[in-house]
């Protein structure tokens, strides 16, 4: 999230609670049914994924969100980021993340953030034997 980018409209220059975002990130780690974090209307029955790490970092005016996992649902990263943004804006509490995951209700998760500023950094594959 960069205050100089078009994505800045999403949080309208409000101060984000970076520490709460970092705290909330840990609730995504592990194997969960991420049904609440995929676009509504998306086909596919299996929404179980494993998130190995979610890191929230501050670099100047930017907040960087890095996710590592075994796969991602359609718009999952954008919705997780939108949910972390809601935590940073103090619309929801960090511990609410576990309830959103349990309830599997898309309407409880954050907005789907725009793709602007979203980058795929690395893809790793296990060796095939």
What are these language model-derived features?
Residues 1-7, 11:
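Single conserved hydrophobic/aromatic residue that forms the stacking wall/gate
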Residues 15-129:
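Core RNA-modification/binding signature centered on pseudouridine synthases
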């Amino acid at each position: 999230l960069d205050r100089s980018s078009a994505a800045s409209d999403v949080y309208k220059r409000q101060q984000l609670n970076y520490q709460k975002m970092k705290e909330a990130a840990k609730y995504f780690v592990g194997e969960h049914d991420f049904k609440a974090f995929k676009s509504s209307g998306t086909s596919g029955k299996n929404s179980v994924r494993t998130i190995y790490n979610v890191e929230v970092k501050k670099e100047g005016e930017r907040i960087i969100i890095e996710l590592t996992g075994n796969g991602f649902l359609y718009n999952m990263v954008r919705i997780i980021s939108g949910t972390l943004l809601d935590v940073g804006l103090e619309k929801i509490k960090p511990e609410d993340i576990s309830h959103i995951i349990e309830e599997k209700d898309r309407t409880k998760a954050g907005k789907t953030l725009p793709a602007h500023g979203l980058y795929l950094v690395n893809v790793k594959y296990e060796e095939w034997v």
